[in-house]
């Protein structure tokens, strides 16, 4: 039944209640004009009677409308949009990756065979074929029905396409991460220091200062245990691969300064591809290596390259440069009126003196330090030729040091 017609029917619970009331109710004689009115009156007196038009309006109010108007639906299965979605939904295709799914459960080289089979079947598969009942009858020669062969071929093609899409996404993600890291200046500086450090450690593996620095560097890599172990054993044979990787990345990122950013990303990808092929052939002792194993080794080197670049970014932040912080004028304390008048008086008194003495008033906050005037020193008994010292230098000529808590009284002629 169409969902629009299905929602016109009363809910199942109400239908059951109506059927129970009808079965429990005693059979009545054939309705007459007076009898129909009497039965309606009796039903109304019992409280079970509801006019058909009102009952239909009640059912329609529950399931008609949009959004919140449908909250009165008895169950999610009877919700109109849920029914439409269920009737028109497409078949769910689970995600598959022939290279990485079901680790350790596939026979050797079976992933490689499935991948190449899906690639070859992709061109000859009829995607619009509709299976009929006669297609499920087994063939007399092969014992396999055409429908079974078509479904198996479709599964291989689907697995191949999904595997290719996932590997494309992985490669795009790697390129974006490498491009972002290589574009940072800190990565080049940190990679240069890291390469210099591992080269010095390789020449002098028993140096205690270098080993102490190694432990400090290892503290920056806390996510990947394989990378930490290789970094701790970088001078040993089992950590030689990491030393080669650092040398390759250093030659691309640090040495080749004339390369563009896109060329550096391409060079790093080519290096990962070459390293993956080399070590895959070294493992299998043959030029032929299953493509799934080669892809896994390349993926391992890609992750390790990202670890090296991220570590270089962390190390490049530590620079021996002096940081100058610009302090805004608004963050300084405002001069009070008393300090402003003192500074003005000192500036006026210093007019005509040497430039060096005039500049010293405003250097390093000198304008905020009070010093007694020449007239005050003469009145106190000090000689006119006595140099005026700052208040922090102690008492000068028997005059006590000025305290900020003391109230300032202007002298004669001062305003």
Swiss-Prot record:
Subcellular locations according to the entry: Host nucleus
The induction annotation reads: Expressed in the early phase and late phase of the viral replicative cycle.
Q: Name one GO cellular component term.
A: host cell nucleus
* Source domain of life: Viruses
Coiled-coil intervals? none
User: Where, per the database record, does this protein carry Phosphoserine?
Assistant: 75, 360
User: Keywords for this entry?
Assistant: Host nucleus, Late protein, Phosphoprotein, Viral genome packaging, Viral release from host cell
- What are the cysteine partners in each disulfide bond? none
Q: What is its main location?
A: host cell
Q: Where is this region: Interaction with packaging protein 1?
A: 1-173
Matches recorded under InterPro entries: ADV_PKG3, L1-like
Quote the biased-composition stretches of kind Low complexity, using this chain's numbering: 381-394
Q: Ranges of Acidic residues compositional bias?
A: 400-415
Residue numbers marked as site, Cleavage: 351-352
Q: Please provide the Gene Ontology terms (biological process) for this protein.
A: viral DNA genome packaging; viral release from host cell
Keyword set includes Membrane: no
Q: Which family does it belong to?
A: Belongs to the adenoviridae packaging protein 3 family.
Kindly give any further remark recorded in the entry.
All late proteins expressed from the major late promoter are produced by alternative splicing and alternative polyadenylation of the same gene giving rise to non-overlapping ORFs. A leader sequence is present in the N-terminus of all these mRNAs and is recognized by the viral shutoff protein to provide expression although conventional translation via ribosome scanning from the cap has been shut off in the host cell.
Spell out the HAMAP family in the cross-references.
ADV_PKG3 (MF_04058)
Role: Involved in viral genome packaging through its interaction with packaging proteins 1 and 2. After proteolytic cleavage by adenovirus protease, L1 52/55k protein is removed from the capsid during viral maturation.
Q: What name is this protein filed under?
A: Packaging protein 3
Instruction: Identify the species of origin.
Output: Human adenovirus C serotype 5
Source organism phylogeny: Viruses, Varidnaviria, Bamfordvirae, Preplasmiviricota, Tectiliviricetes
């Amino acid at each position: 039944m169409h969902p629009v017609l299905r929602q016109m029917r009363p809910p199942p619970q109400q239908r059951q209640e109506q059927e129970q009331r009808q079965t429990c109710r005693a059979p009545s004689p054939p309705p007459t004009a007076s009898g129909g009115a009497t039965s309606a009156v009796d039903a109304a007196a019992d409280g079970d009677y509801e006019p058909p038009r009102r009952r239909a309006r009640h059912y329609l109010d529950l399931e008609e409308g949009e959004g919140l108007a449908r909250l009165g639906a008895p169950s999610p299965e009877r919700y109109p949009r849920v029914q439409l979605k269920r009737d028109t939904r497409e078949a769910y295709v689970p995600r598959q990756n022939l290279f990485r799914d079901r680790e350790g459960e596939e026979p050797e080289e079976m992933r490689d065979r499935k991948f190449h089979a899906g690639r070859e079947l992709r061109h000859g598969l009829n995607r619009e074929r509709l299976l009929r009942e006669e297609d499920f009858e087994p063939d007399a020669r092969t014992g396999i029905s055409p429908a079974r062969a078509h479904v198996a071929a479709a599964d291989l093609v689907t697995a191949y396409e999904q595997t290719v899409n996932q590997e494309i996404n992985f490669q795009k993600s790697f390129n974006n991460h490498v491009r972002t890291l290589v574009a940072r200046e800190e990565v080049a500086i940190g990679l240069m220091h890291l390469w210099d450090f591992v080269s010095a450690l390789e020449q002098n593996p028993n140096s205690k200062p270098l080993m102490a620095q190694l432990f400090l560097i290892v503290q920056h890599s806390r996510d990947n245990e394989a990378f930490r172990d290789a970094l701790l054993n970088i001078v040993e044979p089992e950590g030689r691969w990491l030393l080669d990787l650092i040398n390759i990345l250093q030659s691309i990122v640090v040495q080749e300064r004339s390369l563009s950013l896109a060329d550096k990303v391409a060079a790093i990808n080519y290096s990962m591809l070459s390293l993956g092929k080399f070590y895959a052939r070294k493992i299998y002792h043959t030029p032929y290596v299953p493509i799934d194993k080669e892809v896994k080794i390349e993926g391992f080197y890609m992750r390790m390259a990202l670890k090296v670049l991220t570590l270089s970014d962390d190390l490049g932040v530590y620079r021996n440069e002096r940081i100058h912080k610009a302090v805004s004028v608004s963050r300084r304390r405002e001069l009070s009126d008393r300090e402003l008048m003192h500074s003005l008086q000192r500036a006026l008194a210093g007019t005509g003196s040497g430039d060096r003495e005039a500049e010293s008033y405003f250097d390093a906050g000198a304008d905020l330090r009070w010093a007694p005037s020449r007239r005050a020193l003469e009145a106190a008994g000090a000689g006119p030729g006595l140099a005026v010292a700052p208040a922090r230098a102690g008492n000068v000529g028997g005059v006590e040091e000025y305290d900020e808590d003391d109230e300032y009284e202007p002298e004669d002629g001062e305003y």
